[in-house]
Structure formats: structure tokens, C-alpha cells
Amino acid sequence: MAASDTERDGLAPEKTSPDTDKKKEQSDVSVSPRASKHHYSRSRSRSRERKRKSDNEGRKHRSRSRSKEARRHESKDKSSKKHKSEEHNDKEHSSDKGRERLNSSENGEDRHKRKERKSSRGRSHSRSRSRERRHRSRSRERKKSRSRSRDRKKSRSRSRERKKSRSRSRERKRRIRSRSRSRSRHRHRSRSRSRTRSRSRDRKKRIEKPRRFSRSLSRTPSPPPFRGRNTAMDAQEALARRLERAKKLQEQREKEMVEKQKQQEIAAAAAATGGSVLNVAALLASGTQVTPQIAMAAQMAALQAKALAETGIAVPSYYNPAAVNPMKFAEQEKKRKMLWQGKKEGDKSQSAEIWEKLNFGNKDQNVKFRKLMGIKSEDEAGCSSVDEESYKTLKQQEEVFRNLDAQYEMARSQTHTQRGMGLGFTSSMRGMDTV
């Protein structure tokens, strides 16, 4: 009986060991990818446990002390395995290797074959599963990204269609409103209330919509119809206004000029009739306002009348009467007349007659002298009919001029080494002969 108890006790912990080993394998797989490297050691631990079962069945004849020691050893191994699996996986593998060395002497060849088969199976299964999982996750991500891009495209196209439909509906509403307003203006009062209510409702709806649409609606006003025609009409109206203003200004200027001319005529008439004081009095009596300009014009007109009475010369109308002194202007006009009037026949003086009758004894010399003095050649005919006294004087003059010329030529020949003789009226040889 005692032996049977010991066998049961020995078998119980051994039966529980495969469950714990399965849990350990699951924890090792889920902990880290590094654990996948140690599939070989796990397969060894499984074969070890099976061999233990077979050994314990064959060792039923062993003593109770041996079973107690085994129990203690296994309980210690369990506690150490739990701690090691949670904290350090490397220590567990080292303890498994030690157990493998103890049991390696029993069935070496079978154990190696089983290990190789299981390790290859475990590795292949784990690697294929991880690859399948990765492939599935990647395909799912691709499908999700494709579906997202499709959703985005659909949402964009929908938003565009909505915008287009809204703009079309707005244009239709505007056309309908413009037509209704043009047709039914006399019914405006009855329909204005309903329109205002509907507009307020539309505004509320627009406010409830996203903000960007309301902004775009408020910022873009409805285009006015026939904008080009309005601009052309505006330009024509502006031109017409400018022409009207120019006409008005021209009329005002013409009126001012007419008034000034009238004032000047009045001032001239007043100056002709009497003094400036009387003229101003006459203007005051007539009812016209006397300005400083009118007073100055009256004074200048009085001065002009005075100069005209003294000299008989009037200042022309194209001169400014305020800028021209009438007395000085009269003196200048007298001088001009004296200069430009024609000479009379009986106004020759005695000196003029003497210079005209002057004779140098040479015709060429006489002609040159008369040209220089401005004496006309018509008087040559009158020179023949001269008195005896005048004839004597003319002869004396000729002799004097001849003697002077001869002396001058002699002096010139001596001092200037015959560079030139005389004034050019006579030859050098003739002067030398006379000497």
C-alpha cells in the first residue's frame, strides 16, 4: 500500500507538468520575439518529461525516501520555474539543459530524432504563422487606405456637386425675384411682408450652415444688370455736365468783359467832359458803384485829356492807360515825326552849301567825298552856275589841298621808305615830280 501511495504521489505532479509546460510555451511565445529562438530547448523539455513518466513506472520498487526526495526536488523546481518564467527566461533554459544532461544517457538516439522532428515542426509553424499575420495586417492596412482615399474622393465630389447645385439655385432665385419685381410693382406692399419673412428664414438657415458658405454669400454681391451700358451712360452724363459748366463759365466771363468795357467808356466820357472829381460825382449820381479801379481809370483818363489838349497827340486804345504816361508818349511821337518826315527844298543852310561845293581838284576824289558825306549827285549840275566870289574861294581850296597832299607824300616817302604814297587819291610819282 505504501508503495502504491508513493506511486500516486509521484504520478500526480508528473501529470500536472504537461499543462504547466503548455502555459509556459504560450507565455514564452507572447513575451518577446527572442523566445522564438529557443524552440529547440522546449522540445527537449517535452521529451524529457515523457521519459520521466516511463522511468517512474519502471522504478516502482524504489523506497519511500527516494520518492520524498523526488517530491521535494520537483516542488523546488516548480517554484523556481514560475519565478524564472516571469523574470528571467535564460536561467530556465540553463536548468533545462542540466536536466537533459542527466537523462541523456538513457535513450540518446530516439531523443535526438524526436527533437529534430518537433523543433523543425515548431519552427516552421511559428514562422509561417507570424508571416501570415504580418501579411494579413499589411493587406488590411492597404484595404483601409484604399477605402479612405475612395471616401475622400467621394466626399470631395459630393461637396463640389453641392456647391454647384447651391449656386444654380441662387441664380434661379435671383432671376425669379427680378422678374417678379418688374412685373408686380403695384403689389409690392402686400407681398413685402411675406418676402421679408422668407428672407429672414433663409438667413437663419444660412447661419446654421458652415461659416464659409455664409461668408462667401455675404461677400459676393449680386452683379448689377447691364454694367457696360451703365458705365457708358455715366460717361455721357459726365461729359454733358462738363459742357454745361464750361458754357456757364464762358457766359460769366463775357458778362464781366462787357461790364468792364462799359465802365471804361463811362470813365473816358467823364474824363472828356471834366475833371476826375466831377467824373466820380457823375458816376455816383448815375447809381454805379465806385470801386478803386474805376477811380484810377478816371484819373488816367483826365491825364490823357490834358495831354491831348496840350500836344494834340492821343494815346492809342491798345495801350494800358494806367501804365503809359500820356505826356511822355506825346514827346516821343514828336521826335519820330521830325526824324521820318521829308526834307523841304528851301531849308538848306550855308554850311551845307559850302560842303556841297567843295572841290579837291580831282573828280574821283570829289565823288568819294560826296558819297561819304551823303551829298546827292544831282547838285553837280547846279555847281556851274556859281558867282565869281564863290569861284575864287573854290580855286583857293583846290590849291591848298594840292599843297597839303604833296607835303604829306614827301614826308611819307622819307620816313616810311616809300611803303605807300598819300591817301590813295594820287600816284606816288606825281607827288615826287611836283616837289
Curated annotation (Swiss-Prot):
Basic residues: compositionally biased ranges: 35-51, 112-214
Keyword vocabulary terms for this entry: Acetylation, Coiled coil, Isopeptide bond, Phosphoprotein, Ubl conjugation
Residues bearing the modification Phosphoserine: 4, 17, 30, 32, 104, 377
Record-listed cross-link Glycyl lysine isopeptide (Lys-Gly) (interchain with G-Cter in SUMO2), residues: 376
Cross-link for Glycyl lysine isopeptide (Lys-Gly) (interchain with G-Cter in SUMO1), residue positions: 376
Modified residues (N-acetylalanine): 2
Database matches in InterPro entries: SMAP_dom
Entry-linked Pfam families: SMAP
Biased composition (Basic and acidic residues): 1-27, 66-111
Coiled-coil spans in chain: 230-272
Modification type Phosphothreonine: residues: 6, 16
Annotated region (Disordered), positions in chain: 1-230
Family: Belongs to the RSRC2 family.
Stated name of the protein: Arginine/serine-rich coiled-coil protein 2
Native species: Bos taurus (Bovine)
Gene designation per UniProt: RSRC2
